[in-house]
Amino acid sequence: MSKLEELDIVSNNILILKKFYTNDEWKNKLDSLIDRIIKAKKIFIFGVGRSGYIGRCFAMRLMHLGFKSYFVGETTTPSYEKDDLLILISGSGRTESVLTVAKKAKNINNNIIAIVCECGNVVEFADLTIPLEVKKSKYLPMGTTFEETALIFLDLVIAEIMKRLNLDESEIIKRHCNLL
């Protein structure tokens, strides 16, 4: 496979995100995700490995916009309660620790969103599933294409929240770390 073919795979995965603007079913999923974020008392995000890094990026951006957002497992993460939202990120949808968190959260409320590549067991606990159906590549190992697409998708979500709430970059700058 040539470098150009690899780039085409990445480009096509990004183009998959167009469906959130061109297909009513996908527009509704995006709107539901954004509505739930805006209405949640607190937002909890969890993923493992590189999906976890993507989750941390998303939690940080939500905090920059003024939301109470937390990455599950950090020492400063508060308890999950009935008015909260849990967003799970898992390429396989079968990661054991993600399933454990989903099971515990389901006993507290039904406000769980799963962002996945493959619809594994985690979707049984989610009341909204967003499958990012990306193409895999021989030279972009394991979940690379999912992780890249998830990062771009979640940045798209941030942009949509900013539009909906009429926020601009100055809101982010106000909450950006200023001690380093």
Swiss-Prot record:
Keywords on record: Carbohydrate metabolism, Isomerase
Pathway where it operates: Carbohydrate biosynthesis; D-ribose 5-phosphate biosynthesis
A GO term, aspect molecular function: carbohydrate derivative binding
Biological process according to GO: carbohydrate derivative metabolic process
Enzyme class: isomerase
SIS domain residues: 33-167
EC numbers for this chain: 5.3.1.27
UniProt key word Isomerase: yes
Residues at which substrate binds: 51, 90-95
Keyword Isomerase: yes
InterPro entries given in the database record: PHI/rmpB, SIS_dom, SIS_dom_sf
Catalytic reaction list: D-arabino-hex-3-ulose 6-phosphate = beta-D-fructose 6-phosphate
UniProt xrefs under CDD domains: SIS_PHI
Active-site residues, record numbering mapped to chain: 147 (proton acceptor)
One Pfam family from the record: SIS
Purpose of the protein: Catalyzes the isomerization between 3-hexulose 6-phosphate and fructose 6-phosphate.
Listed NCBIfam families: RuMP_HxlB (TIGR03127)
Subunit structure: Homotetramer.
Family named by the database record: Belongs to the SIS family. PHI subfamily.
Name of the molecule in the record: 3-hexulose-6-phosphate isomerase
Organism expressing this protein natively: Methanocaldococcus jannaschii (strain ATCC 43067 / DSM 2661 / JAL-1 / JCM 10045 / NBRC 100440)
Gene that this polypeptide is encoded by: phi
